[in-house]
Structures are given as C-alpha cells and as structure tokens.
From Swiss-Prot:
It comes from Bartonella bacilliformis (strain ATCC 35685 / KC583 / Herrer 020/F12,63). It catalyses: D-glyceraldehyde 3-phosphate + pyruvate + H(+) = 1-deoxy-D-xylulose 5-phosphate + CO2. The keyword Transferase applies. InterPro entries: Dxylulose-5-P_synthase, THDP-binding, Transketo_C/PFOR_II, Transketolase-like_Pyr-bd, Transketolase_C, Transketolase_CS. Its EC number is 2.2.1.7. Mg(2+) binds at D151, N180. Homodimer. This is 1-deoxy-D-xylulose-5-phosphate synthase.
C-alpha cells in the first residue's frame, strides 16, 4: 500500500514552518498529520490511540508557543508521535521503537524539542514547575512552560502534589488537561467554548484580580462571600472548582479538535503575566481512525496492522505468554481459596487480570495509576487475613519502593507481588525495562524473591505464593511467550529457598535465575559436545538462597557462573557474597556473574540486545571458555 499524500505536511520541517502557515490551513494539516501517523504505526507498531487524539492540540501548541524556547512537556509520552513528526524527526519516524531508531517516548538526547524525557505517568507537572521556577530565577527570561497531562494520569498523587506546590508558589505554569475519557468533562459545545474564551482573556482575569483586591477593603465576611459567589458561578458555568482550590486559574472545557476554540484560548493564556493556569481540553482517543475510535483500549498500543481493516498482525503461536499463564494459575488458586484478591494499578489487560475480573469481579481491584496506593492498599487487605496479589510491571513497582519497605516488609505482611515485564522489554526501551526488581527486593530482610525458568515453574510459584503467609513474597517473569510446555491444571507448592539441578556435571556449574535457563541448556549441550562436563541448576530463589546447593556446586566445580536478566547487584551478587563469607573463593574457584550491563539499555529486539550483552547461549559459552583460559569461540553452531 502506498503512503498517503501529504503535500502540506511535506512543507513543515519544523515548528517555524508551521507558524508560517495561515490558521485556515491547520485543519488540512491535521488531516495529513493524522494520515501519516496511522501509516507509520501500521508499519512500526506502537502507541496509536493517544497520538491520534492530540493531533490538533499538538499543532495548536507549536503554532501558538515559541518552541523550543517555550517548553512543552508531554506526560508519559504515548501521545508524542505527532509532536516528533512536526519537530524535525519525520525522516526517522519509520525507525520508531527500533534499535538505533527513534524512541517511542520523548527523550532529551533525541531533540531540543523534548525538554523532558518520559515513559512513566504523572511527572510532567512537577518537571514543568521546576522549569518554570528556574526560568523565574533568570530575570532576563520569560519562558512559557506547558505540561500536557491526560485525565488518567491525574489519578496519581504526584500530579496533585505538583499542582498544590505550583499554586502555593504562584508559578507561571500552564497545564493542559487532556481529557480523553469524558470522565470529568462537562458539555463542550458552543456556549462552553464561548465562556472558555471569555474567562481566558487577560482583561477578565485582570478585572477578577481587581475585584478581589477591592473586596478586601470590606469586612472579611463580605469578601469571603464574594469569593464564594464568584467561584460558584464560574464552577457552575465552566467547572474547575477543584483546580481553583489548588491555586490554578481554570479555563475550559474546550473542544480539543476545533482550532477555532483552541487557538484563541491558548493565545490568551500565553499572555498571562503570572500564576498557574489549567486549560481543560476534551479530546477523543483514536480520533480520525474508526477502528481506534471504536476500540480505544485495543488500539492504545498496537502491533503492525492493516490500515484498511484495522486488523493487527500477530505471529501465530500455540505457546501462551507468561502473562496468560500467570492469569490462568491465579484464577485456579482463587477457585480454591476465597481469600485471594487481585490488585492492579491501571493495567488490568497488560497484567492479565482482566480475565480474573471476569470470574471474580468482587475480588479484583483496579486502583488507577497509583502504585504507591496499590501496595499499601494490599498491605491493609493482608492485615485482615486476605491474600492480595499485586500484579504490576517491574518498571512501575519502582514507584512504590517506600511502601514496599515501610508498609509491607517491615511489618512482615504477606503481600504477593506478581512482577510482569521483568528483564529487558524490547521496543519500549530504558523507561520500561524491568532491570532492577531483583536488586531492590532481594536486599530487604526476609523478603522471598523467586523467578520461574518456564511456564510450569511460574504456576508452581503462583501456588507457592498463595500458601505462603510468613511475609512478603515475589515472583518475576518476562514479557512474551513461554517455551511451550504442557501445563498442569494446578501448580505445586515449592519448598522455600530450594533450587533444582537439571543436569549433573563435574567441571562447570551454570546456575540460572529466571527464564534464560533455556539458553543455559543450549549452552550446556554445546559444551558437552566440546568435552566440557557441565552442571545446570535452576536457582528458583534469589532470596533465600539455596545455600546447600551453592556450597556443593562451589566445592565440586572448577568454574561457577550465574546467569540472570537483571542489573548488577542482583542474584549473582548475592551468590558471590555468600561464597565469600563461606570461604569458598579461596581455593581457585573461578566465578563469573552474567547479567545486564551497568547501563540503561535503549529500545530494540530483546533477542538482539540479550545476545549483544552476552545473555544468550553463545555468550554463556564464551564466558565458560574465557574462564577456563580457552580461546573464545567467535562462531558457534547452535
């Protein structure tokens, strides 16, 4: 299929070109930009619906504000594809989320038009406030700072912390509330747009401030009544009372797809001399592409798809994903135990808990984008004798670390953590990599940390977590499919802190924590063909370690290598520390720890990246050869 014709967009190489266009051309530009984005994502995959919903808003912001001197901060970054196309990156847009290509999110190192990197939710207002106050400290600068945040991201407490601070500082900050869920939106018709234009005019705001000053000359009772009356009238007509309470001047709601509404309001807001303002813009997720409009949840993040039919291209496979195996196992356990409940932070589909909710709706809790609350909420449930499973991506669990320590671990509450997307995740890059959970959980006293090597082991760990009541317990598993094992109806209960040996050898011990075990077994086969006798062990637990197994392997082998898909300081570090304490390193044992490198890994194919960092079979074999002093095998027939 040929690419769409975009003659007007072809002339826009930067926001300078955009600002040279007459306003009458912007609607046509929006159509072309939307067509280009649909065509791009149909080839690359990525986040579609959010970007389609902000095409007009993106154009309007770059048209009215002097970017990059004025700062536009996109919360999360899912919606930033139109922004990237308009800011000089169109020639690379078809490399989106590919190794060496454009990031799927905003990224400071990628463009001067990306003043702040994103990937996680609800950070934009805090970052914007910091930039606004820095600008205020530079007396010669008068820079506009605009934070664009979705209504979903407003469920996170950090957004309100920032707004409360901005109001207290009376900071010159513009927040665009992109309301694409219609959850808090009053009517957005002609009257609403007219009122928004009216109250956004500097003259109206100036008059309002003068009346406030004048009212202070009267007794306090009269000034308070006047303020309440004005607040009630504005709230009744255009909403925004909550934001007024936080110290923001509220404007809206306005139609985020109508330039006649957007441009005058943004122009008026740009002229405000001081104080924070919130512009409430109502948009439609997936706007302009029927399949995405009709099924916003299915077109939030997409694989490659057919533009005409909207049908997504998915590889045919009989293997279940680890997420689906977890969901199946949890449902099975919940069938046997009415005290099991499931908790997610706005990711029911991504974590597989949507299936759990279909069967146990009263035991499923989606708390919104509120990871800190999710963990302490689970702690409260555990206090009452129930068995909470917090299903969460590894990268998002980082946001609740204080709650894990203070509210769960110190109190030894039996909260179960099902950690999805562990390890390198691929196209979403550094902001979404699940690299650190082993490190930050295994350091906590009496915190059980598990990782399955395959789908059956995952089922065992779900059941083990369900019956474990002595304190917090976690298990981590990657994005993607398992290795295709036949699954039992129900998992088995594992002995805490005990690993297993899959192969016995005499010279080299390969100890794996997690799903790289399949690569370890391939490596062991190749080593055996080279005459190197190899033991393969599945650790199962990073904490508590199987100390008896570690001692035996250290005493009986010449080389001891740990393998994990996690950061420095994880499983291998715990093993090494144990061996040192046991004086098992003093008699010539050669120890190597294979792990993710000490760097943030950018987006790319997981297979290619893991091969590059030495976590595939070839990398494991090379580690063995170098440990033994052999010449490294550059080309291996695997």
């Amino acid at each position: 299929m040929s690419r769409p014709l975009t003659p007007l967009l072809d002339c826009v190489l930067s926001p300078l070109d955009l600002r040279a266009l007459p306003a009458s051309d912007l609607a046509r530009l929006a159509d072309e930009l939307r067509a280009e984005m649909i065509d791009v994502v149909s080839v690359t995959g990525g986040h579609l619906g959010a970007g389609l919903g902000v095409v007009e808003l993106t154009i309007a912001l770059h048209y009215i504000f002097n970017t990059p001197d004025d700062r536009i901060i996109w919360d999360v970054g899912h919606q930033a594809y139109p922004h990237k196309i308009l800011t000089g990156r169109r020639d690379k847009i078809r490399t989106l989320r590919q190794e060496g290509g454009l990031s799927g999110f905003t990224k400071r190192s990628e463009s001067i038009y990306d003043p702040f990197g994103a990937g996680h939710s609800s950070t934009s207002i805090s970052a914007g406030l910091g930039m606004a106050m820095a600008s205020a400290l530079k007396a010669e600068e008068r820079r506009n700072v605009i934070a664009v945040i979705g209504d979903g991201a407003m469920s996170a407490g950090m957004a309100y912390e920032a707004m409360n601070n901005a109001g207290a500082l009376d900071a010159r900050l513009i927040v665009i509330l992109n309301d694409n869920d219609m959850s808090i939106a009053p009517p957005t018709g002609a009257m609403s747009a007219h009122l928004a234009r009216l109250v956004s005019r500097p003259s109206y705001r100036h008059l309002r401030e003068r009346i406030k000053l004048f009212s202070k000359k009267f007794p306090k009772f009269f000034s308070e009544q006047a303020s309440r009356s004005e607040e009630f009238a504005r709230g009744f007509l255009v909403g925004g009372t909550l934001f007024d309470e936080l110290g923001f001047y509220y404007v809206g709601p306005i139609d985020g797809h109508n330039f006649e509404h957007l441009l005058p309001v943004l122009k008026n807001v740009r002229a405000y001399p001081n104080g924070p303002v919130l512009v409430h813009v109502v948009t439609h997720k997936g706007k302009g592409y029927a399949p995405a409009e009709e099924s916003a949840d299915k077109y939030h993040g997409v694989n490659r798809f057919d533009v005409v039919t909207g049908k997504q291209v998915k590889a045919q496979s009989t293997r279940l994903s680890y997420t689906k195996v977890f969901s199946k196992a949890l449902i099975e356990e919940a069938t046997h135990d009415h005290k099991i409940v499931a908790i997610t932070a706005a990711m029911p589909t991504g974590t597989g808990l949507d299936s759990f909710a279909e069967k146990f709706s009263d035991r499923m809790f989606d708390v919104g984008i509120a990871e800190q609350h999710a963990v302490t909420f689970a702690a409260g449930i555990a206090c009452e004798g129930y068995k909470p499973f917090v299903a969460i991506y590894s990268t998002f669990l980082q946001r609740a670390y204080d709650q894990i320590i203070h509210d769960v671990s110190i109190q030894k509450l039996p909260v179960r953590f099902a950690i999805d997307r562990a390890g390198f995740v691929g196209a979403d890059g550094a902001t979404h990599a699940g690299s650190f959970d082993i490190v930050f959980l295994a350091t906590l006293p009496e915190f059980v940390v598990m990782a399955p090597s395959d789908e059956v082991e995952l089922m065992h760990m779900v059941r083990t977590a369900a019956v474990y009541d002595q304190g917090p317990i976690s298990f981590r598993y990657p994005r993607g499919e398992g290795i295709g094992m036949d699954l039992p109806q129900r998992g088995e209960v594992l002995e805490i802190g005990k690993g297993r040996v899959l192969r016995e050898g005499s010279r080299v011990a390969l100890v794996c924590f997690g799903t790289q075990l399949s690569e370890v077994l391939v490596a062991a086969d190749e080593l055996a063909a080279e005459g190197i006798s190899t033991t393969v062990a599945d650790a199962r637990f990073a904490k508590p370690l199987d100390k008896d197994l570690m001692r035996r392997l250290a005493r009986e082998h010449e080389v001891f290598i740990t393998i994990e898909e996690g950061a420095i300081g994880g499983f291998g570090a715990h093993v090494l520390q144990f061996l040192a304490q046991e004086a098992l390193l003093e008699h010539g044992l050669k120890v190597r720890t294979l792990r993710l490198p000490d760097e943030y890994l950018n987006h790319g194919s997981p297979e290619k990246i893991l091969s590059r960092v030495g976590l595939d079979a070839k990398g494991i074999i090379n580690a063995v050869f170098t440990s033994l002093g052999y010449e490294t095998r550059k080309t291996l027939q695997i």
